[in-house]
C-alpha cells in the first residue's frame, strides 16, 4: 500500500513539473503582476464607487480596505491605504473618457487572468463578445457580492465579539480562521468557474487549499522578513513601497497559478489512471 502511494506521488510530482514547465507559470505570474499594477487603480475606483452607491456597504468598504492592507502588500499597508483613498477621491473628478479608459484597463486584466488560467487547462478561449459580457458582469456585480460577503463577515465579527464578552473562547478561534476560509473559498470558485471546461470541484478544493496555505504562510513569512530585515528601506528610501508591492503581487499570482496547476494535474492523474493519457505524451509536449 505504501509503495503504491509513493508511486502515485512520484507520478503526481512528475506530471506537475512537466505542466509547470509547459505553462511557464513564473513568466505568467510576472505578466499578471504587470497587468495588476496597471489595473489596480481602475478596479479600486469601480469597487468603491459601487460601494458608495449602497450605504449599507459602508462598513463593508472599511472591511475591504483592511483586507487590502493585510493582503495586498504586507508591511506596506498604510502607504497602500493612503494611495487607495487618493485614487477614490481623484476618480470623482475624472471625465467620461478617462473613466471609460480606466474601465477598459480593468477589463483587460480580467481578460488576461481568464486566458492564463484557461491556458493551464489547455481549454479554448471563449467568444470575445461573450467573454466581455462576463467580464463586465464581474466588474459590476462582483463588488456587490464582495460587499455582501464583507457585510456578513462584519456581522459574524459582532456575534463573536459578543461571545468573547461572555467569556467564550471558541468565537475568537473561529474568527482567526475566517480570512483563510474566505481565501480558500475564493480560490475554489476561481478554479471551478474560470476554466472553459468542466472542473471537478473536489480537485478545485484541493488545489485551492494548497494555494490558500501557501498564500497565508507566504504572507506571514513576507511580513516577518520585511520587519526583521528592513534593509530595503535603506536602499529604496521613499520608493520602498513599489518593489515590496511588486514582489508580493508576483508571489501571490504564483501561489494562485500553482493551485490552478495542481487542480489541472489532478484531472490529468484521473486520465492517466483510465489509460487516456500517459506521462510520455506529457513529456513530449514539454520538449
Curated annotation (Swiss-Prot):
InterPro entries from the UniProt entry: UPF0761_bac, Virul_fac_BrkB
Gene Ontology CC annotation, any one: plasma membrane
Signal peptide stretch: none
Membrane topology summary: Multi-pass membrane protein
Top-level division of the source organism's lineage: Bacteria
One Pfam assignment: Virul_fac_BrkB
Positions of transmembrane segments: 37-57, 93-113, 128-148, 174-194, 204-224, 238-258
Record's keyword terms, sorted: Cell inner membrane, Cell membrane, Membrane, Transmembrane, Transmembrane helix
Keyword Transmembrane tagged: yes
Compartment annotation: Cell inner membrane
HAMAP family: UPF0761
NCBIfam families xref list: PRK01637.1, yihY_not_rbn
Family according to the record: Belongs to the UPF0761 family.
Protein's UniProt name: UPF0761 membrane protein MS0032
Natural source organism: Mannheimia succiniciproducens (strain KCTC 0769BP / MBEL55E)
